C-alpha cells in the first residue's frame, strides 16, 4: 500500500528587495502626490527608480497605490495628531488643531486628497480616534460653559473639523508658512466654538502649550528609498 504524506506549506516571507521596492513606491507616491494629485503612475515608478511593469507586482492599478498611501497616512495621523490631555477644553481644542496642523502641513496636497478625495469615506475609520477626541473635547467645553451651547455637540464638532480643513485649503492655495498656518488653525477652531477674536488671540499668545514648536536641529539626510542598483553614482572630482 502506498503511503501518502502531506507536507504543510509555510508561506514564504516576501523577498527583502520586493519589500524595499514597495516602500520605495510608497515614498515616491507621497512625494509626487503632494505636488500633483493627478501625477501619472509612470512618474511615480520613475521617482522610485523602478519600471512601470515592476509596479504591477505590488499594485494592480494606480488607484490601488493611491489608496494604500492614503489609508496609511490617515492611520498615522489619526493617532499621531492626538495631543496630551489638558484640563481646559478650550486650550485642548486649540492644541488639537495645532497638533493636526503639524502632522499635515508638510504634505498639504496629499492631506487634502485624504479628507476630501474619493477615499474620504474609507479613511473615516482611521481618523475615528481623532474625531472621537474632538467630539469629547467639544462636549467638555459645552458642559463647562467654555464653548457655545446653541449648536448640538455632534454638529459643532463637525463644524470645527470643517474650520480646520478650510485653513488647510487656504494654506495650500496661498502657500502659507508653517507658523502662520499654526496660528490660523487655532484661531479658526476657537472662533467656531464661540470665542471672540480678541479672546482667542490672547489665549494663543499667552498659553505656552500653544506656542509654535522650535524647528528641529540639523538632521542627517534621509536614506534613499530607491534600490541600490538604481541610485545615481557620484564620481568624485579630481584633486586640483
Each language-model region and where it sits:
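Short hydrophobic/aromatic patch on the recognition helix
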Residues: 49-59
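Alpha-helical DNA-contacting segments of helix-turn-helix folds
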Residues: 59, 63-73
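Short, hydrophobic secondary-structure boundary micro-motifs
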Residues: 41-42, 110-115, 146, 150, ...
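Basic, helix-initiating cap at the start of DNA-binding domains
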Residues: 1-47, 63-67
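Amphipathic alpha-helical packing segments from all-alpha helical-bundle domains
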Residues: 95, 119-169
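Short hydrophobic clusters on alpha-helical segments that form packing/core surfaces
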Residues: 25-32, 73, 100, 104
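C-terminal peripheral helix-coil segments that are non-catalytic and often amphipathic
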Residues: 2-9, 136-143, 169, 173-240
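Hydrophobic alpha-helical connector segments
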Residues: 68, 79-109, 115-122, 182
Amino acid at each position: 500500500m502506498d503511503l501518502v504524506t502531506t507536507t504543510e506549506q509555510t508561506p514564504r516571507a516576501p523577498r527583502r528587495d520586493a519589500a524595499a521596492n514597495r516602500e520605495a513606491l510608497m515614498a515616491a507616491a507621497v512625494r509626487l502626490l503632494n505636488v500633483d494629485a493627478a501625477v501619472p503612475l509612470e512618474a511615480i515608478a520613475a521617482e522610485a527608480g523602478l519600471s512601470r511593469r515592476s509596479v504591477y507586482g505590488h499594485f494592480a492599478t494606480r488607484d490601488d497605490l493611491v489608496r494604500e498611501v492614503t489609508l496609511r497616512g490617515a492611520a498615522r495621523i489619526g493617532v499621531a495628531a492626538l495631543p496630551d490631555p489638558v484640563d481646559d477644553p478650550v486650550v485642548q481644542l486649540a492644541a488639537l488643531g495645532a497638533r493636526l496642523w503639524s502632522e499635515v502641513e508638510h504634505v498639504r496636497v496629499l492631506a487634502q486628497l485624504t479628507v476630501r478625495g474619493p477615499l474620504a469615506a474609507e479613511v473615516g475609520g482611521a481618523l475615528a480616534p481623532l474625531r472621537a477626541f474632538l467630539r469629547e473635547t467639544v462636549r467638555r467645553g459645552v458642559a463647562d460653559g467654555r464653548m457655545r451651547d446653541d449648536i448640538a455637540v455632534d454638529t459643532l464638532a463637525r463644524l470645527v473639523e470643517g474650520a480646520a480643513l478650510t485653513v488647510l485649503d487656504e494654506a495650500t492655495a496661498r502657500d502659507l508658512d508653517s507658523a502662520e498656518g499654526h496660528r490660523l488653525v487655532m484661531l479658526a477652531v476657537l472662533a467656531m466654538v464661540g470665542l471672540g477674536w480678541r479672546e482667542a488671540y490672547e489665549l494663543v499668545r499667552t498659553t505656552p502649550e500653544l506656542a509654535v514648536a522650535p524647528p528641529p536641529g540639523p538632521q542627517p539626510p534621509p536614506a534613499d528609498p530607491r534600490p541600490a542598483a538604481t541610485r545615481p553614482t557620484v564620481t568624485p572630482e579630481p584633486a586640483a
